[in-house]
């Protein structure tokens, strides 16, 4: 009510606010007319038939006893005037909509319970047309035959959604008391129309409650729900009372179903993400295993290559060592050959002299032997001293020649001895140098092997660093 008063105060230019509401004269109506008018009265939309105008006059008479009710009634009439102007504008633009359908909305007056002193079965007095002649939204009374109940219900269902959209666009909200009456009268609509409306209402409720419904279906379902509230509020006036029922609690089963659906969707999304992560993990494991196999094969190939290279290098080093030994042997042989070649003439002379002295010595020994054999060995020996002396002299002379020759050969032999000693000393020095070369060759071989090992380690370290950089960059 306060919201409606605030809306009416926001529009002070409406002429219906200051106009006094005259008291309608009492009139008698038939029960049939009363039944039809009370059936189609609603606190949401304005009435266009004569029965709705008579019910509005009755409500005006009931609420005009106090100034507060009079002020509220004026505010409601002002809002109804504004709403009627909008409806007239819409009716002018819509050529396919009949006038009776456009004016079949109910009165916007709130339902109030009649005092206990008045008879609830009293006939509703109709308000004459000339009472509200100054209002722009006063409907004209149409002399039409009373429609049937099913026809009016169908007309109500067709026009309620458009009227509800119009009321929502104008900014008019419903009070909490009308919601209870709508729940009560909706049951009567279901009873009157039969099971024809049940499938559509259930499907609309399902479409409205599902979390995956589109905004368009939700808006349509909300319009249909407001339509049923309008129909229930209009049918609540049939009994003459406006008691509001307690609000219906939301369907906990539907909420639980939606929660379960959301939870299932979340679980499905989690399962999908876990599957994606597992697939990515398997891909990475496959990539790592493939890279590890490749690195192992490359490592084995490199080790085989290094081993073969090491064998080749060891063979080369052995061959080099052998060649060096041969070279040193040849060098020493050359040195000895040069020394011997320088002494070859002397040696040849020595051979000639040796032959001569050997022959002379042999002859001397033979001569001495012959001379000794000629000496008599019995008692009757007679020696010629002269011949013996001559033989001894000859022998001594030959011995002296031999001694002289030997004396001549002694310095040569001493020289040869010095040369041989020098040669022995040189050969010892060469042996020591050969041993030093052997040790140096062993050291170079070990250092070469160590160098190859360090190079292989350096290559492996550089390869590992390159692989780590590649993995970090990926």
Curated annotation (Swiss-Prot):
Tissue expression remark: Highly expressed in young siliques, seedlings, flower buds and open flowers. Weak expression in roots, and not detected in older siliques and mature leaves. Expressed in the embryo sac in prefertilization ovules and in seeds following fertilization. Detected in both embryo up to the heart stage and endosperm throughout most of the syncytial phase of endosperm development. Not detected in the cellularized endosperm, when cell division has ceased.
Keywords from the UniProt entry: Cytoplasm, Cytoskeleton, Phosphoprotein
Biased composition range(s): Basic and acidic residues: 1-10, 89-100, 128-137
Biased composition (Low complexity): 38-55
Record bears the keyword Phosphoprotein: yes
Motif (QWRF motif): 283-286
Positions of region (Disordered): 1-149
Chain positions with Phosphoserine modification: 66
Subcellular location: Cytoplasm; Cytoplasm, Cytoskeleton
Post-translational modification remark: Phosphorylated.
GO molecular function annotation: microtubule binding
Record note on disruption phenotype: Aborted seed development.
Cellular-component GO terms for this entry: cytoplasm; nuclear microtubule; nucleus
Biological process per Gene Ontology, one example term: cell division
Signal peptide positions (record): none
Induction comment from the UniProt entry of this chain: Cell cycle-dependent regulation. Up-regulated during the G2/M phase.
Family under the similarity heading: Belongs to the QWRF family.
Annotated function: Microtubule-associated protein required for seed development and for microtubule function in the endosperm. Associates with nuclear microtubules during mitosis. Binds to microtubules of the spindle and spindle-poles and to midzone microtubules out of which the phragmoplast emerges. Not associated with cortical microtubules. Required for endosperm cellularization. May be bound and sequestered by GRF5 in an inactive soluble form during the early stages of mitosis.
Oligomer and partners: Interacts with GRF5 in a phosphorylation-independent manner. The binding to microtubules occurs independently of the interaction with GRF5.
Protein name per the record: Protein ENDOSPERM DEFECTIVE 1
Biological classification of the source: Eukaryota, Viridiplantae, Streptophyta, Embryophyta, Tracheophyta
